[in-house]
Amino acid sequence: MVFGISDTPSVEPEQLENLIQDGFKLIDVREQDEWNAGHHQSAEHIPMDTITESMDRFKDSEKYIFVCRSGARSGRVTNFIVSQDIESYNLSGGMKELQNFSEKIFNSEGNSGQII
């Protein structure tokens, strides 16, 4: 199953905290340097280029939200995971947009993070 980017299931950044409380898993697909500079405290880091080899980490009983810097990479990952019959959503606008709605973005040292 292939989706165009406009068909990608997505959620808005202002919905994220409630969705995490409801049990959604947040997966950050950015590169290591991007993650180190700033990531959401509830996120799990699985870089985009390791998604296929990490499929055993995704369960069809769970719901996932994927995020990258702007939403493009995570959109492609979301479409792939959806094609595997796993409920998944892209975070619209990515980390750049999320930083306007969340105070839970930290660097790898636990200090206030930045999005690069």
Where are these regions (language model features)?
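Rhodanese-like catalytic fold shared by cysteine-dependent sulfurtransferases
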Residues: 1-25, 32-63, 72-116
